[in-house]
């Protein structure tokens, strides 16, 4: 399994880091078989798997439950788990309780938190306690209401400079990596050059140290539309619908199950069951 040290070496050597979300045992198992470097159990599971309109309703219990499943499916892959909405915008003591629960109960190797400002002290607090933290700047979905929707961040010089400052503060606080979401590629490149920790981009262009995508977006599974920054490498959705539709048809027309899908009794047992009459 790759570790924080390996990711730093990959950045130094110019080897891109691959990260993919996973929310359950089978998706994690497939991600590990495909040799993904990191798995992110994102609170995006609230929208992708649980059907919420945002990530806000996701709880600490949800993150623990799903991370445990992912851990069972990917025993040899570095796993990062999101701290959900409001689980770290409380006192540092309460934050530690939530962080400890996620790490101890789920087996996550690192936690991800969004934003800067007061979150910088949270990163430092968790790091000092021995919990690796991945920072997340740019478009931060938990704060989408404050940001005015799902919009590109850092498009003007002033806000870009603020993001650069925040990125440096995250590194100084002890973050082991930084996710940059929906920022101009020029800004992402500049931040990547000024940090020693790896940057993982999602909608941040090519000049970052790694990329992350949502599992379901990548394979077109259960999604109606995807953001501009997503490339769909395959489409399993059409095949799944086709297979289920065929199942429905065959049941309705009594083509399924066939004899080969059924179990039988020995002839003498049948005779006994039916009282000698068949």
UniProtKB/Swiss-Prot annotation:
Binds 1 Mg(2+) ion per subunit. The keyword Ribosomal protein does not apply. The active site is at 181 (proton acceptor). Gene3D superfamilies: Phosphoenolpyruvate-binding domains. Coiled coil: none annotated. GO terms for cellular component: cytoplasm. Keywords: Cytoplasm, Magnesium, Metal-binding, Pantothenate biosynthesis, Transferase. GO terms for molecular function: 3-methyl-2-oxobutanoate hydroxymethyltransferase activity; magnesium ion binding. InterPro entries: Pantoate_hydroxy_MeTrfase, Pyrv/PenolPyrv_kinase-like_dom, Pyrv_kinase-like_dom_sf. Disulfide bonds: none annotated. Its cofactor is Mg(2+). 3-methyl-2-oxobutanoate binds at residues 43-44, 82, 112. It is found in: Cytoplasm. It catalyses: 3-methyl-2-oxobutanoate + (6R)-5,10-methylene-5,6,7,8-tetrahydrofolate + H2O = 2-dehydropantoate + (6S)-5,6,7,8-tetrahydrofolate. Belongs to the PanB family. This is 3-methyl-2-oxobutanoate hydroxymethyltransferase. It comes from Bacillus cereus (strain ATCC 14579 / DSM 31 / CCUG 7414 / JCM 2152 / NBRC 15305 / NCIMB 9373 / NCTC 2599 / NRRL B-3711). The lineage of its organism: Bacteria, Bacillati, Bacillota, Bacilli, Bacillales.
């Amino acid at each position: 399994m790759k570790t924080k040290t390996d990711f730093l070496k990959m950045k130094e050597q110019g080897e891109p880091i691959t990260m993919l979300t996973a929310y359950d045992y089978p998706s994690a198992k497939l991600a590990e078989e495909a040799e993904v470097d990191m798995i992110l159990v994102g609170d995006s599971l609230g929208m992708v798997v649980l059907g919420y309109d945002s990530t806000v309703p996701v709880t600490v219990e949800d993150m623990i439950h799903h991370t445990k499943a992912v851990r069972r499916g990917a025993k040899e892959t570095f796993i990062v788990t999101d701290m959900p909405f409001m689980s770290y915008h409380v006192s540092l003591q309460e934050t530690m309780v939530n962080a400890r629960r996620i790490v101890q109960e789920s087996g996550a190797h690192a936690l991800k938190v969004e934003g800067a400002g007061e979150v910088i002290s949270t990163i430092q607090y968790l790091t000092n306690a021995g919990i690796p933290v991945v920072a997340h700047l740019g478009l931060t979905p938990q704060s989408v209401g404050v940001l005015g929707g799902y919009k590109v961040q850092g498009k003007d010089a002033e806000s870009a400079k603020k993001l650069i400052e925040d990125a440096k503060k995250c590194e100084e606080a002890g973050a082991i990596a930084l996710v940059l979401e929906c920022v101009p590629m020029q800004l992402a490149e500049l931040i990547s050059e000024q940090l020693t920790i790896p940057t993982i981009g999602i909608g941040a262009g090519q000049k970052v140290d790694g990329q992350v995508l949502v599992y379901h977006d990548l394979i077109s599974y259960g999604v109606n539309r995807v953001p501009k920054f997503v490339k769909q490498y395959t489409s399993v959705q059409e095949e799944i619908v086709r297979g289920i539709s065929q199942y429905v048809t065959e049941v309705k027309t009594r083509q399924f199950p066939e004899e080969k899908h059924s179990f039988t009794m020995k002839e003498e047992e049948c005779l006994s069951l039916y009282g000698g009459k068949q």
